[in-house]
């Protein structure tokens, strides 16, 4: 739920920039409170489960080891919601609530957003399912978009410094979100390897 809230915020913020629609940016900002609330509830559940083995078993955990990883994942997801909030604030503060780029560049930014969304969703799925292969796929896909920010910036025409900074801040926020997804995938890898699977044998 925290991942999907962050993803929705990201989509609304970037769509706001694409269409010059401040209402969408405001909607994204309003969701930040919901994201924080989910994060706090998750921390409470994790903390309580860690100290109560019966509760941990009730939510499908045989031991407390995954809870440490889940706490880190929750924090990373909360930070991705902060990234989306940053993009929404740029949309509200920028002139005409949009970026000073052509439609082709805006499409590249939206495509990049879609790729980032896919990474964050896959990373959480890998952690929940303890799926080693999905976790590895996240890292492989990330390597394929690792230079996307620089590629888009390099292709921009000469522009006002303020406009350039806004574009750069949006792209960096998306890049950071992708990096958090990779961190979550690394945690998912550890969770998967902690279980008996085709990759490991636990004595």
Regions found by a protein language model. Give the residues of each.
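Cytosolic, long alpha-helical scaffolding segments
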Residues: 1-203
């Amino acid at each position: 739920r925290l991942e999907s809230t962050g993803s929705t915020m990201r989509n609304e913020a970037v769509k706001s920039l694409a269409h010059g629609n401040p209402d969408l940016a405001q909607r994204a900002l309003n969701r930040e409170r919901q994201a924080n609330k989910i994060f706090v509830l998750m921390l409470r559940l994790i903390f309580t489960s860690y100290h109560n083995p019966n509760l941990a078993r009730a939510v499908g955990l045989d031991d407390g080891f995954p809870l440490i990883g889940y706490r880190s994942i929750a924090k990373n997801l909360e930070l991705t919601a902060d990234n989306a909030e940053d993009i929404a604030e740029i949309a509200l503060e920028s002139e005409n609530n949009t970026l000073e780029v052509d439609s082709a560049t805006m499409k590249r930014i939206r495509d990049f957003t879609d790729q980032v969304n896919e990474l964050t969703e896959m990373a959480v799925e890998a952690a929940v399912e303890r799926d080693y292969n999905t976790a590895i796929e996240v890292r492989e896909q990330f390597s394929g978009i690792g230079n996307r920010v620089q590629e888009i910036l390099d292709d921009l025409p000469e522009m006002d410094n303020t406009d350039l900074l806004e574009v750069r801040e949006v792209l960096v926020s998306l890049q950071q979100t992708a990096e958090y997804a990779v961190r979550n995938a690394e945690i998912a890898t550890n969770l998967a390897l902690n279980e008996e699977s085709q990759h490991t044998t636990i004595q």
